[in-house]
From Swiss-Prot:
Entry keyword set: Cytoplasm, RNA-binding, Transferase, tRNA processing, tRNA-binding
Family affiliation: Belongs to the TtcA family. CTU1/NCS6/ATPBD3 subfamily.
Pathway(s) served: tRNA modification; 5-methoxycarbonylmethyl-2-thiouridine-tRNA biosynthesis
Species, as recorded: Oryza sativa subsp. japonica (Rice)
Compartment annotation: Cytoplasm
GO molecular function, one term: nucleotidyltransferase activity
Broad class of enzyme this protein falls into: transferase
Lineage: Eukaryota, Viridiplantae, Streptophyta, Embryophyta, Tracheophyta
Function: Plays a central role in 2-thiolation of mcm(5)S(2)U at tRNA wobble positions of tRNA(Lys), tRNA(Glu) and tRNA(Gln). Directly binds tRNAs and probably acts by catalyzing adenylation of tRNAs, an intermediate required for 2-thiolation. It is unclear whether it acts as a sulfurtransferase that transfers sulfur from thiocarboxylated URM1 onto the uridine of tRNAs at wobble position.
Domain of life according to the entry: Eukaryota
Protein name: Cytoplasmic tRNA 2-thiolation protein 1
GO terms classed as biological process: protein urmylation; tRNA wobble position uridine thiolation
Keyword Transferase set for record: yes
Region spans: Disordered: 337-363
InterPro entries the record matches: CTU1-like_ATP-bd (IPR056369), CTU1_C (IPR032442), Ncs6/Tuc1/Ctu1 (IPR000541), Rossmann-like_a/b/a_fold (IPR014729), TilS/TtcA_N (IPR011063), tRNA_thiolation_TtcA_Ctu1 (IPR035107)
């Protein structure tokens, strides 16, 4: 997942005048964060790309002839993913048809700038680009949503809408798989967050390298074992064109604490990130709990275990002027328009009651 954790681009720390521990011929240019090996630039390219290739092969992520959409935001992770996957596709004859797929959330001063980077990547890598927008799909931009609800719950709307937008864009491209730039750091953070929240259901699947196999289009994470620092180093040495600004609506304080904690662990033990992922894989708890059967949303046709999908529930709240209608628990809302009416009535009644006792509240 793309994030600007490193601030302005800085050259990686050099490894002094020692020789590369792999080839023994060229001077070492960096110390690998994952292994602490001091290696030259050329050997770094080789091991970085080979490890990703091995991950793809070991997990059977693709088969010849697959049409694959690369979730492209213009950030470092998705840019490196597009570049490396293009190279590996040619070198190892994966025989994949690759596409860039971007989502325009409608964030002025952020997404419009990053999409310019993606458009340059389209030309640089020779990959067709498809852009889908919140405005076209939902009638709202994130700028509009933030004006309506403020900053507190905006990531909930964006996460739900973005996931569905990627699926809808992928369906338009008729692809077999979506690949995303989620890296080892992202997955380790998610493992830790799910443990802290006690979310066993998400913990059981957050380390899967392929998800959504029961959904419309499976998603793969070729960077599952790739360190964020090494992605930054690769992009720097290769002089790749990427966008490095953080989303203006995404402070993500809770995840930020998890990220800093993992960085502290990594400084003490470089393998800490992989150890956390391994722990998450071994933490899967078998359960006899029956999962809800997947159906389709009565309104938009998207996959859902309820009558209305989460996106339609959230949109219902926005369009009714009750943007918090779909936040948190949605039991009762998902049952259809009648339930939405009841929930809206309850929300209005509760708001009136609270205002009568305590004055105005920002609901």
């Amino acid at each position: 997942m793309d994030s600007a954790v490193d601030g302005p681009r800085q050259p990686p720390a050099r490894a002094g005048s020692r020789l590369c521990t792999r080839c023994g011929e060229r001077k070492a240019a960096l110390k690998r964060p994952k292994t602490l090996e001091q290696i030259c630039r050329e050997c770094f390219y080789v091991v970085f790309e080979d490890e990703i290739h091995q991950t793809i092969v070991d997990n059977n992520l693709f088969k010849p002839g697959d049409r694959v959409a690369i979730g492209a935001s213009g950030g470092k992770d998705s840019t490196v993913l597009a570049y490396v996957l293009s190279e590996l596709n040619r070198r190892h004859k994966y025989c994949l048809d690759l596409f860039l797929l971007s989502v325009d959330e409608g964030i002025t001063g952020y997404r419009d700038d990053s999409l310019e980077t993606v458009k340059r990547n389209e030309i640089q890598y020779g990959l067709p680009l498809k852009i889908v927008s919140y405005k076209d799909l939902y009638g709202w931009t994130m700028d509009d949503i933030v004006k309506a609800i403020g900053l507190k719950n905006n990531c909930t709307f964006c996460g739900v809408f973005r996931r569905q937008a990627l699926d809808r864009g992928a369906a338009l491209l008729k692809v077999d798989k979506i690949v995303t730039g989620h890296n080892a750091d992202d997955i380790a953070e998610t493992v830790l967050l799910n443990i802290l929240r006690g979310d066993i259901a998400r913990l059981s699947r957050c380390t899967f390298i392929t998800t959504g196999e029961d959904g419309p289009i499976p998603r793969c994470k070729p960077f599952k074992y790739t360190y964020e620092k090494e992605i930054v180093m690769y992009a720097y040495f290769k002089k790749l064109d990427y966008f490095s600004t953080e989303c203006i609506y995404s402070p993500n304080a809770y995840r930020g604490f998890a990220r800093e904690f993992i960085k502290d662990l990594e400084r003490m033990r470089p393998r800490a990130i992989l150890d956390i992922i391994k722990s998450g894989e071994n933490f899967r708890i078998s359960t006899t709990t029956r999962m809800p059967e997947q159906g389709t949303c009565e309104r938009c046709g998207y996959i859902s275990s309820q009558k209305l999908c989460k996106a339609c529930v959230l949109l219902d709240g926005l369009n009714r002027g009750l943007p918090k209608l779909g936040i948190g628990r949605t039991k009762g809302i998902a049952g259809g328009d009648g339930d939405c009416e009841q929930q809206a009535t309850r929300s209005e009644r509760n708001r009136s009651s609270l205002q009568g006792k305590h004055g105005n509240f920002d609901f």
